[in-house]
């Protein structure tokens, strides 16, 4: 018989715990049930495995309320029978628990209730390996019933109890697959670089991969009015589980936005599971539910255990004894005998942070703009093709349009081109003769194309692409005989390759990340990791579209955050591409062409123009500053030495060339394999020992590289030098000096010295031959980047000021808000506001507070065992190419020369301007860093409260090799140059205020209103919104109160 609902005052409410013993005796369950029991209003009955599995339901204990949830081996149907018989109040209803075992039904149910989920599609198989006509798999996507999912995408078994989840990566990021699984030791995922094809042995859900900044959020509800959220490092990043000294996985409580709280309420109601855990993805300003787990408790949070016990108590009383008061007693029963903790003895050592932290000045923001690491020389082959096979290939991939060009990037497309080229080369060789120089050159170029396409293990679509552009057409009869149609008979083929991050570049980027971790943030390395792991470090990494830049960013992130494993998952998880901000020179192409033309005049005119109006105090103000005197006299020497090196490489390539000339069936050459975008991760000692070029460049391609440079540098027929080739000659010299010194090329040292002398003058002047021109070109190239930097700085200041205002207002509101400190501590926190308030869309007022759609994670201070939860640092890293570094530096150096800023001092001090003038090159891994500090002892309205510190590094230059000492020998063996340390751009002790920085940069930056509007939902900017309601909520949340005894402050 059921128990009457109107239980007497003296009669205790019975709570049946009908759960497998393994779950009953878990620490969180024990902590919460002990607290419920301590109220004295409840009798708790544990059924036990024997009763649940063996006894008939009629003999099971009778209870008023039932806690019952599925786990492995649990007889859910039997428990349903008991529930029908006794009709207890169910904390989690039983029928919907069947839904949780099928991911398809979970997603359908979420959609039915309007809860956002990732875009997905289901592939259902009745038998393993069943072919389905609606499922298509290609190299970089799968298509389900016409809906296409591009890599990266996620593959989940439909069985909710199968935790083997795969993520497949695009070939542009290196390809491969990461398998996620239940934690084994300290691993939660494993990367398989060679797995490209999806599974076919069962039914799967395919869903869009959501970039979340490498963080997972788990939400725990206790009834529809309470939700607690915790974040952890996503297993997608490197698969290493972060654990505390007790061996528990490290998770930190984070604040939910109002919209997310509403989602938690809806999940709880939709599945009728009062105690329910679910996974939340925060991506690009929106939130999505990607899994619902059912009964789940937070681990290792005593504050949460208190809350959960209080909420469940109210739930039980409302269901079975509504006449009894559910008001929480002023002191919780299990707290009565606890000594009050004092904060007096607390130090600030817990966060492991020293340096400026803890003094009056706090680091608030680090912004770094970084050039990519060491790369192979960039190459280009151009040839006109008339061969039918190549023209047909162009038509195959441009949709059959005779006048449309096509780009070949994917492995399949490049394999097609390689097959065609292999067939054409024997024919080309048979027609060779000394008298037919044009045919000979064409055959050589085809061989070069073939050699590039066959170069294995080093390039992918990011690094190697082919463009086919039709040039001539004829009219031919249509295949059906009716009329004529156009057909191309000649096309221009352009093959671009090279520019790959080398093993040295990867090592440099990782080491620079480590350097930043240990030196840019107070705390000697542990400070940053502590901030990051506790969600007080807001990190975003941006990269241009180029593979070498993306991989530099990923390797840097690996060093910065002390990650492990391959770069592909780190790249996809943590690096955002923004080509409009970090790629391209289109905005300044005409000005740069004009600068190059003037530069050509200056060089060919000799020393006369360079040294007109020279100021000994301001040498950088003259046209063409940095060029050597009588620069034109060095050009013949440059050509002569280039010929000498080219001839040596030709002889080295001869053997390779002869071997290729021997007849062999082209089909025995291994097929083109979609190689990894990572470049080489380690130096190939075997190749070096065998006397071969470093990397995967053979002598044939090395010769092609030098022969092209030699020909382009000087046109013998016209007797004309091309000064735009000087940087490329210097680039090749530098690469071979570092990576191919074992080939002992005679004259390479001398060639490098001449090329460096000229390049040191040419390269900076390509971005403007005088400061005014440099400023104009720089502002055009870096306009969007400068705008984003100003947004970053402004957002940081707004957040810091909001926190400061909260602290200042705390004393005024503490009397009313904390008249009873205990009442606040023991009341139900996190209760939701009305849903109509949460559903309000963002208004225009919020636009200025968040000009980008960056995902945010905020530590929840009330539940965090962290000593300084208000401490928060924003880091923004921008990885780009040489052009953007030069452009940014030029704006910082010369912004005061703009008409609108006449009379203003330069942002860069005189001594730094002098050093920069002598710094000829911003080499690989060169960087500019802006650090924003807040002096918390200065008034909020004083501009000096926020100051900027500017530093730069010239990167990994070759100067250490010039000493020819032991260090130089060691560097040559490793093929890796050290990165020069940062140099200040301001005088020591000077104060560049943020206000001044904004005034000086704003004329050259894209205005905030020109950036795309943020797609941030209501609540994301609300963490630090200045509205009265949010201020009040934050004052309640933030533990700034000196006498609080709630954990650590």
From Swiss-Prot:
Sites where N-acetylmethionine occurs are at 1
Q: Where in the cell is it found?
A: Cytoplasm, Cytosol
Write out the residues that bind substrate: 22-23, 182-183, 218, 232, 296-299
Query: Where Phosphoserine occurs along the chain?
Result: 820
Q: Which UniProt keywords apply?
A: Acetylation, ATP-binding, Cytoplasm, Kinase, Nucleotide-binding, Phosphoprotein, Transferase
The organism sits in which domain of life? Eukaryota
Q: Name one Pfam family in it.
A: His_Phos_2
Q: Where is this region: Polyphosphoinositide-binding domain?
A: 354-428
Can you state which reaction this protein catalyses?
A: 1D-myo-inositol hexakisphosphate + ATP = 1-diphospho-1D-myo-inositol 2,3,4,5,6-pentakisphosphate + ADP; 5-diphospho-1D-myo-inositol 1,2,3,4,6-pentakisphosphate + ATP + H(+) = 1,5-bis(diphospho)-1D-myo-inositol 2,3,4,6-tetrakisphosphate + ADP
Q: Which residues pair up as cystines?
A: none
Show the InterPro entries listed in the entry.
Acid_Pase_AS, His_Pase_clade-2, His_Pase_VIP1, His_PPase_superfam, VIP1_N
EC category: transferase
Per UniProt, where does ATP bind? 103, 156, 163, 182, 207-210, 216-218, 234, 279, 291-293
Record's SUPFAM superfamilies?
A: Glutathione synthetase ATP-binding domain-like, Phosphoglycerate mutase-like
Q: What does this protein do?
A: Bifunctional inositol kinase that acts in concert with the IP6K kinases to synthesize the diphosphate group-containing inositol pyrophosphates diphosphoinositol pentakisphosphate, PP-InsP5, and bis-diphosphoinositol tetrakisphosphate, (PP)2-InsP4. PP-InsP5 and (PP)2-InsP4, also respectively called InsP7 and InsP8, may regulate a variety of cellular processes, including apoptosis, vesicle trafficking, cytoskeletal dynamics, and exocytosis. Phosphorylates inositol hexakisphosphate (InsP6) at position 1 to produce PP-InsP5 which is in turn phosphorylated by IP6Ks to produce (PP)2-InsP4.
PANTHER family hit by this protein: DIPHOSPHOINOSITOL PENTAKISPHOSPHATE KINASE, INOSITOL HEXAKISPHOSPHATE AND DIPHOSPHOINOSITOL-PENTAKISPHOSPHATE KINASE
Q: What is this protein called?
A: Inositol hexakisphosphate and diphosphoinositol-pentakisphosphate kinase VIP2
């Amino acid at each position: 018989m059921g128990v009457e609902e109107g239980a007497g005052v003296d009669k205790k409410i019975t709570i049946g715990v009908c759960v497998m013993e393994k779950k009953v005796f878990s620490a969180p369950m024990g902590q919460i049930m002990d607290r419920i029991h301590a109220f004295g209003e409840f009798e708790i009955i544990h059924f036990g495995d024997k009763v649940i599995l063996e006894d008939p339901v009629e003999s099971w204990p009778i209870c008023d309320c039932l806690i019952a949830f599925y786990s492995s081996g649990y007889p859910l149907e039997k428990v349903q029978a008991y529930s029908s018989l006794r009709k207890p109040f169910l904390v989690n209803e039983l029928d919907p628990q069947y839904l949780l075992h099928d991911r398809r039904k979970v997603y359908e149910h979420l959609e039915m209730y309007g809860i956002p989920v990732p875009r997905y599609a289901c592939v259902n198989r009745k038998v393993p390996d069943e072919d389905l006509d609606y499922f298509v798999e290609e190299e970089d996507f799968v298509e389900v019933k016409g809906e296409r999912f591009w890599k990266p995408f996620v593959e989940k078994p439909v069985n909710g109890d199968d935790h083997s989840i795969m993520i497949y990566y695009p070939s542009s990021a290196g390809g491969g697959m990461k398998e996620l699984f239940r934690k084994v030791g300290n691993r939660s995922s494993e990367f398989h670089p060679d797995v490209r094809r999806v599974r076919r042995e069962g039914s799967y859900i395919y869903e869009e991969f959501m970039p979340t900044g490498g963080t997972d959020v788990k939400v725990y509800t206790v009834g529809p009015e309470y939700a607690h959220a915790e974040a952890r490092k996503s297993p997608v990043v490197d698969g290493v589980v972060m654990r505390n000294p007790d061996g528990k996985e490290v998770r930190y409580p984070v604040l939910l936005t109002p919209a997310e709280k509403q989602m938690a309420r809806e999940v709880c109601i939709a599945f009728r599971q009062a105690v329910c855990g679910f996974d939340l993805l925060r991506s690009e300003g929106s939130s999505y539910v990607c899994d619902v787990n059912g009964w789940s408790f937070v681990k290792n949070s005593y504050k949460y255990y208190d809350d959960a016990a209080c909420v469940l108590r109210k739930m039980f009383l409302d269901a079975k004894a509504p006449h009894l008061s559910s008001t929480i007693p002023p002191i919780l029963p299990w707290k009565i005998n606890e000594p009050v903790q004092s904060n007096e003895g607390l130090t600030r050592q817990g966060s492991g942070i020293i340096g400026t932290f803890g003094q009056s000045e706090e680091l608030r923001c680090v912004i770094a703009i970084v050039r990519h690491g060491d790369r192979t020389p960039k190459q280009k082959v151009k040839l006109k093709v008339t061969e039918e096979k190549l023209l047909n290939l162009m038509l195959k991939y441009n949709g059959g349009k005779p006048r449309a060009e096509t780009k070949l990037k994917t492995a399949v497309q490049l394999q097609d081109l390689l097959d065609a080229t292999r067939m054409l080369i024997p024919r080309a060789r048979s027609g060779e003769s000394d008298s037919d120089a044009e045919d000979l050159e064409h055959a050589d170029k085809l061989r070069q194309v073939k050699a590039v396409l066959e170069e294995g293990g080093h390039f992918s679509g990011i690094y190697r692409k082919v463009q086919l552009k039709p040039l001539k057409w004829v009219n031919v009869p249509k295949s059906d005989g009716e009329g004529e149609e156009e057909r191309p008979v000649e096309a221009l083929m352009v093959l671009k390759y090279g520019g790959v991050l080398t093993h040295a570049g990867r090592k440099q980027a990782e080491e620079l990340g480590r350097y930043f971790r240990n030196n840019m943030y107070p705390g000697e390395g542990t400070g940053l990791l502590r901030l990051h792991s506790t969600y007080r470090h807001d990190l975003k990494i941006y990269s241009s579209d180029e593979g070498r830049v993306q991989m530099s960013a990923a390797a840097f992130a690996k060093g910065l955050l002390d990650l492990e494993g391959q770069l592909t998952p780190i790249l996809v998880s943590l690096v955002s591409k923004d080509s409009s901000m970090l790629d391209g020179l289109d905005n300044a192409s005409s000005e740069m062409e004009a600068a190059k033309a003037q530069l050509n005049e200056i060089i060919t005119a000799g020393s006369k123009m360079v040294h007109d109006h020279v100021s000994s105090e301001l040498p950088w103000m003259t046209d063409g500053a940095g060029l050597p005197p009588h620069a034109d006299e060095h050009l013949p020497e440059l050509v002569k030495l280039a010929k000498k090196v080219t001839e040596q490489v030709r002889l080295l390539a001869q053997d390779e060339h002869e071997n290729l000339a021997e007849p062999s069936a082209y089909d025995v050459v291994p097929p083109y394999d979609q190689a990894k975008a990572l470049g080489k991760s380690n130096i190939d000692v075997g190749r070096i020992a065998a006397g071969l070029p470093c990397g995967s460049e053979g002598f044939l391609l090395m010769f092609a590289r030098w022969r092209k440079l030699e020909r382009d540098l000087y046109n013998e027929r016209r007797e004309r030098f091309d000064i735009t080739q000087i940087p490329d000659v210097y680039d090749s010299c530098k690469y071979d000096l570092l990576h191919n010194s074992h080939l002992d090329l005679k004259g390479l040292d001398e060639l490098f010295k001449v090329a460096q002398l000229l390049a040191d003058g040419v390269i900076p002047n390509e971005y403007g031959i005088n400061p005014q021109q440099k400023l104009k070109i720089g502002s055009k190239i870096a306009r969007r980047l400068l705008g984003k930097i100003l947004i970053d700085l402004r957002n940081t200041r707004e957040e810091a000021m909001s926190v400061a205002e909260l602290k200042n207002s705390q004393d005024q509101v503490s009397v009313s808000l904390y008249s009873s400190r205990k009442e606040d501590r023991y009341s139900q926190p996190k209760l939701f506001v009305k849903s109509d308030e949460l559903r309000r869309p963002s208004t225009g007022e919020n636009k200025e507070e968040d000009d980008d759609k960056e995902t945010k994670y905020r530590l929840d201070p009330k539940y965090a065992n962290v000593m300084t939860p208000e401490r928060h640092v924003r880091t923004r890293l921008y990885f780009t190419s040489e052009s953007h570094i030069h452009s940014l530096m030029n704006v910082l150096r010369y912004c005061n020369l703009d008409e609108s800023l006449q009379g203003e001092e330069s942002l860069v001090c005189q001594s730094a301007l002098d050093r920069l003038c002598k710094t000829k090159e911003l080499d690989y891994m060169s960087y500019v860093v802006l650090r924003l500090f807040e002096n918390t002892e200065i008034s909020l309205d004083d501009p000096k409260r926020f100051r900027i510190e500017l530093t730069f590094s010239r990167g990994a230059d070759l100067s250490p090799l010039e000493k020819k000492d032991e260090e130089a020998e060691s560097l040559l063996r490793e093929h890796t140059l050290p990165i020069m340390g940062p140099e200040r751009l301001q005088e020591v002790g000077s104060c560049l205020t943020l206000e001044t920085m904004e005034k000086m940069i704003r004329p050259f930056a894209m205005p905030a209103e020109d950036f795309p509007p943020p797609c941030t939902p209501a609540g994301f900017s609300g963490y630090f919104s200045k509205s009265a309601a949010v201020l009040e909520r934050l004052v309640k949340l933030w533990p700034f109160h000196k006498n609080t005894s709630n954990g650590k402050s």
